[in-house]
Every structure is written in C-alpha cells, then in structure tokens.
Regions:
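Short, structurally constrained coil/turn elements
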Residues: 3, 34-36
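Short active-site neighborhood of thiol/selenol oxidoreductases, capturing the structured segment around
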Residues: 3-16
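Hydrophobic beta-strand anchors of alpha/beta hydrolase catalytic cores
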Residues: 9-10, 40, 63
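Receiver (REC) domain active-site loop signature in two-component systems and cognate sites
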Residues: 14-17, 57, 69
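Typically the conserved alpha-helix immediately C-terminal to a functionally engaged Cys/Sec
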Residues: 19-34
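Structural microenvironment flanking redox-active thiols in thiol-disulfide oxidoreductases
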Residues: 45-50
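Structural micro-motif
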Residues: 55-64
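Non-catalytic, surface beta->alpha helical segment in thiol-disulfide oxidoreductase systems
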Residues: 64-99
Length: 100
C-alpha cells in the first residue's frame, strides 16, 4: 500500500501537558499495532502553532485523523485506548487476511 494512502493520525501535544505525556506510550503501542493501516505523526503545538491553528486545536492532547487529505475524525483532550480504537475502526481500511 502506498504510504500516502494510509490514514494519518496526528497527535497534537505539548511537553508541558501531563495528559499528553501520559498518552505517549499508548499511541506508540497503537502505531506499532496498526502500522499496516495508518501512520502517526506527533506535532508539538509550542513548536508548530501554525499547524495547531490550522487544525483548530484548542487543547492538548488532541488527535486528528486525516483521511484522503480531509479531517475524518478528532478526539480532544485525554482519551482512553478503547475510544481511540473505536474511532480508528470506523475509518481505517480492513486488515487483509494473511496468505495461507
């Protein structure tokens, strides 16, 4: 699959945000688990306020799922793994069965 075809999960965070720091390991695990179906990018809002403004980030952490160059879904604030996975399942391509 072409890299650009996979949906992109953008994690807006700040080093100063405790809730965002606590989500780091959860997202790292999720990125490894779903690496065939999505990409993950981290954006520090303190270093890239332009992107935070463009995506209308009002709080950190914020997750924005970009699919086909459009925002498909978002979760604002600290959220649990089940909520993130539920959001992703609605938008990620189905896993292809492994060859026998």
């Amino acid at each position: 699959m072409i890299d650009e075809a996979r949906p992109l999960l953008v994690f807006f965070f700040s080093e100063r945000s405790g809730p965002a720091r606590r989500m780091e390991s959860l997202l790292a695990h999720l990125a490894r688990k779903e690496r065939e179906r999505m990409r993950l990018r981290r954006i520090d809002v303190d270093l890239r306020p332009d992107l935070a403004e463009r995506f209308r980030v009002a709080e950190v952490p914020t997750l924005v799922l970009v699919k086909e160059r459009r925002v498909a879904a978002r979760l604002d604030g600290r959220v649990s793994s089940p909520r993130i996975e539920a959001m992703l399942e609605q938008h990620l391509p189905a896993l292809e069965p492994a060859a026998a």
